[in-house]
Structure formats: C-alpha cells, structure tokens
C-alpha cells in the first residue's frame, strides 16, 4: 500500500463515526468494500449497543443558562441543588457532595461516579476541551453500563473555559434538566479471515469508530489502514498460523466491539495464540511504542527484533486501553503498537484529530515494522510468546476492568 493510497483512505473516512451511528456503519461498509477490492473476503458481525437521543439538556447556574450536552443514558430528571466543585477525593471532600450537583475534574470513571453517588450527589457536571484553545467544543458523553448499574443521576458535559468561569464567579446553585429517549441499536465488527497451515490463529485488531467531535484519523483509522495493508500482504505471502483481522466497532464506548467478538467466539479462543492490536500509528510526530500484556520475555524479544531491523521503539509491560484488553483478559497474550505524539503536536478525542496529523511515509514505516514482526510470529514453528498471563498483568486487568480498585 503506497503513501498516496494510505492518505486517500484517511480522506475518504474523515468524518465523525460514533459507535452505533449510521456513520459508523458507513465506515464499516467502506472497510469491507476496501478489503474486498484487495481480493479478501470480509464479513460484518453486528452486536447490540445502547443508544440515546437527547430531547432536552439544559444547565442553569445562578439563573443563567450555559451551553452543555446531556449525558446519554443518564435518564430523565429535573434537579435543582447547591453547586459543588469537587477538587479533591479525600473522605472530607467527598462528604460535601451530599444533596449537591457536583462538578468533577477530568473523565468521570466508574470509581469517581460511585464515590459521589455513595456520598449523596444528586447530579453531576464534567468538562472537557482545553482552556488554551479558541474553540468552545463540547464532547458528547454517555453514562456507560457499569456506571448505570450503580444508579442513574442526571449529568451534563461543558467546555473547560465554562468550568473555569463558573468556579471563578463562585456559583452557588445549579439546575440540570435532562430528557432523552433510550433504545438499542447495532454496531459492527468487520472480520477478514485468512486460514493458515494449522488450525491456530493470530488475531489482529484495530477500532474504526471515533468520538463525537473527531474525524478519527489518528485515533484510529491509522490502525485500520495498518490492518488493511497487512491483510493484503499476508493474502499474497505464506503464513503458518491462520490470521483474523478484526476492525472493531464502538471501542471508544468501552471496547464494546472486541468484548462482543470475544463473547460471540468463545469456542475459538483456545486456538488464538496472540493478539496484535494497532491503535494510533503513523502520526507525523511522536515515538513508537509497544505495550505488552504478556510475560516479560516478550519485551526483550521486541527490543532485539527492533534493533535487528534498525527501528526505534519503547517497550513496556502493561495493560493498554484498547481492543487488546478483552483478549488479554481471556489469557491471550496481546501486544499493542502505537506512535504516541506529544500533546502539543497531536491530540485525540477532539475536533483536531484530522488527516492533517498523518504522514503517509511514516505510516509505511510503521506498517513495515509491524508486518515484519507479525511475519516472524506467523511463521514460527511454535509462537515464541507464551500463552499465559502473568500475575502482575492479571492484577492490572482486574483494575482496568473494574473488578477491583487501584490502590491509592
């Protein structure tokens, strides 16, 4: 795949495609069609996702209405209460949430939500964006399923500049009105199957959905381009192990596509020896990394292999927040490759993730390295990455998947 062909795919898919949306399906069909144009057989595998349509979402602070977006799947409510900005998460600070609409810093994860709920919050406000950027964009957020199980309270998202302003003004009272229709729809995985000489597989994953403001070129059409290029390569070259290329839907909504694939293909999992995941490669700036949810010997192997190839890499053992994780949780060793740019050169999950961040030549270099590594794995007599999950990775998987809380 040439640089020009790579950049054409970025141009063709430069639109927002949130999980479960018509635009996401449009992109799935594009990837399927592109794979078929390469002579590959591709299938769409649907899976159910929760969806919502906001009818009304308002935030009023001390009588002034401010721009906001209501959280999907956070129910219907009209709540007026004292405003409280939760700066710290110690027991005293959390105790002040009782009976209040609480604004929190950063992403509203499961444990933060549980803490404010357990301490009596009646509503919540989050914010995103950057105070140093000119835009007043507001991301569309959702109350994910694990949070819903703890109970629903209404919430809205605002821009960071608005958050600074309301704290600076010393706002006292907040009112949230939220009304929405909640329903179910479909997202899709696109699957390409390349049988090998033996009945064991290496699974390649990359998600193709985006967040609500993003064209998703860097995160993560780049990974999908990598999968297309590798699928084309291995369709023309021998490989002892079979290969499955899975373009995952709804990753940005909680790894829903890879979770759905693992659940729907339980009988296949013992045959999978390795997962190779691509999430954010080929950016103009940044360093190339490999995050290995594997035994530690894999790190040395990758460092040696990169030195042999003359390719710069930073390798670590960890859990990567991407579609590799559901496979690792089933005991399948998983390696995620990415090129991580400094935040002042390329950002994600906002309107600045566009094809302008990408470089065709860098994409080619990254894909060539990953393909070379995959070739070693695919033609090994025995896959050298042990099919076992060390205890330290099991512990990190438990934390990431919310089965236990990280120590403070």
Which residues make up each language-model segment?
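N-terminal capping segment at the start of a domain
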Residues: 1-23, 38, 132-144, 209, ...
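Alpha-helical metal-binding/catalytic segments enriched in His/Glu/Asp
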Residues: 35-36, 106-107, 117, 200-255, ...
């Amino acid at each position: 795949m040439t640089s020009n062909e790579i950049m054409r795919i970025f141009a063709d898919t430069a639109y927002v495609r949130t999980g479960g949306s018509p635009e996401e399906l449009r992109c799935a069909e594009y990837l399927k069609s592109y794979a078929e144009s390469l002579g590959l057989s591709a299938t769409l595998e649907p899976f159910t996702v929760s969806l919502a349509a906001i009818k009304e979402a308002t935030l009023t602070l001390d009588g002034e209405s401010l721009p906001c977006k209501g959280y999907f799947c956070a129910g219907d409510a009209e709540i007026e209460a004292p405003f409280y900005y939760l700066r710290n998460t110690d027991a005293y600070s959390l105790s002040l949430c009782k009976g209040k609409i609480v604004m929190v810093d950063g992403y509203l994860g499961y444990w933060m939500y549980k803490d404010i709920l357990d301490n009596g919050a009646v509503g919540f406000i989050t914010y995103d964006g950057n105070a140093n950027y000119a835009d007043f964009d507001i991301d569309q957020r959702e109350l994910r399923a694990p949070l819903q199980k703890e109970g629903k309270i209404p919430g809205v998202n605002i821009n960071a500049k608005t958050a600074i302003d309301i704290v600076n003004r010393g706002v006292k009272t907040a009112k949230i009105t939220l009304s929405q229709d909640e329903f179910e729809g479909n997202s899709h995985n696109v699957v390409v199957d390349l049988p090998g000489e033996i009945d064991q597989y290496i699974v390649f994953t990359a998600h193709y959905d985006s967040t609500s403001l993003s064209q998703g070129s860097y995160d993560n059409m780049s990974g999908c381009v990598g999968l297309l290029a590798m699928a084309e390569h291995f369709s023309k070259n021998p490989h002892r192990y079979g290969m499955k290329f899975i373009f995952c839907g709804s990753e940005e909504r909680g790894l829903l596509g890879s979770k759905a694939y693992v659940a729907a293909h339980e009988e296949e999992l013992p045959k999978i020896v390795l997962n190779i995941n691509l999430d954010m490669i080929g950016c103009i700036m940044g360093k190339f990394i490999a995050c290995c949810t594997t035994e530690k010997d894999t790190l040395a192997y990758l460092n040696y292999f990169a030195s042999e190839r003359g390719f710069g890499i930073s390798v670590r053992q960890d859990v990567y927040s991407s579609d590799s994780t559901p496979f690792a949780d089933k005991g399948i060793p998983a390696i995620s490759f990415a090129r991580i740019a400094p935040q002042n050169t390329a950002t994600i999950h906002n309107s600045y993730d566009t094809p302008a961040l990408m470089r065709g030549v860098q994409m080619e270099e990254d894909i060539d390295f990953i393909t070379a590594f995959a070739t070693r794995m695919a033609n090994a007599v025995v896959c050298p990455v042990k099919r076992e999950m060390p205890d330290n990775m099991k512990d990190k998987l438990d934390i990431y998947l919310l089965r236990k809380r990280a120590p403070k």
